Amino acid sequence: MKVAYFDCAAGIAGDMCLGALLDCGLPLEYLNQQLQALGLEGEYSLQVCRVQRCGQPALQAVVEVLDESPPARPWREIQALIAGSRLAPAVKARSLKVFEKLAQAEAKVHQVPLETVHFHEVGAVDALVDIVGTCVGLDWLQVERVISSPHPIGGGWVDTEHGKLAVPVPAVIELWEMGRVPVFSNGVEAELVTPTGAALAVALAEAFGPCPPLRLEKVGRGAGSRELPIPNIFRLWIGQSQGEEPTEIVSVLQTQIDDLNPQVIAYTCEQLLALGAWDVFTQPITMKQGRPGVLLTVICPPERVPECQDFIFRETTTLGIRHSQQQRTVLERRIERVETPYGLVDIKVACRHGHIVNAQPEFRDCVARAQEFRVPVQTVWLAAQAAWQKRLQGDPA
């Protein structure tokens, strides 16, 4: 699996990511060609130059906005612009995910609905080029997984459209909270992490921590715009994962309930899954004074904790929720489709170290085919397993 590691020892910004990707070999001509899909010709110019930061070489990408008063584009306009473009589906998906995180942070900072967010500091033209360009570069490098180092908090003050703001600026803090990003001080008093850089890391990184075992292929160095007491360089490590299954951070919410209608508990579980929880389950327990109750457990992405927690408080009688973060190890997974006498059925395939360790027919497909042909579900399931085994043996059935 191709992995990209964001080394943010000196910080991260959109232009630094772009510079590092170009330093990794992303052709500038290809990048410009892909960015044309946004229809921003005449609104910006992209310049690239080799520079030094504290004596270390790096590539600096400079996005110059040509309009002195560029329009403030609302989130919905940016969403439509990217979704309706000719960009590759994977580039669109990553770009929209980054902008959505950015919009969520801005909405929380300014206390406005998500759909009314307008991008000013972060946005519009330069943010589009930085974010979409970074996603184009990751796609060109065929990166499947992103991991990031902790982020430096920086310090001091910056001038913005809203006046002087303390570093880190509010949008960056919101993004860090969203992604449960580990932070530290490297002693430098400057803006080291921009909202665009934080959004790229929070949206794209599956985990934050040390670099995993890699067979290193390339290291790209993207320069920041200023000289600092330390090399103002973002390093991008590209390599193949070695020997370890991917790990990711999950949030676990738990609460005990002994005074709620069981029908409401069933409804709560369904709705939590609809809100984005990965798994929801209950266990029977005995509580104080011998009362029977249930332990409700929710496993969800860290960014879904606020919504899941609010829903539990609103719909149940609990007075408190425990939450923790855990690491989980996951196998590489893919979906393959087989032909059976009852139609097509998806097979969920799990791999470890490049070898298949498990393959199971998708149960929903089996149910649908069984209902269509009026046969037992087990009959369809066995037919799908047989078709999969034939494929493994080289028979294209």
Curated annotation (Swiss-Prot):
This is Putative nickel insertion protein. It comes from the Bacteria. The keyword Magnesium does not apply. The keyword Acetylation does not apply. Disulfide bonds: none annotated. PANTHER family: NICKEL INSERTION PROTEIN-RELATED, PYRIDINIUM-3,5-BISTHIOCARBOXYLIC ACID MONONUCLEOTIDE NICKEL INSERTION PROTEIN. GO terms for molecular function: lyase activity; nickel cation binding. It holds the Pfam family Ni_insertion. HAMAP family: LarC. Belongs to the LarC family. Keywords: Nickel.
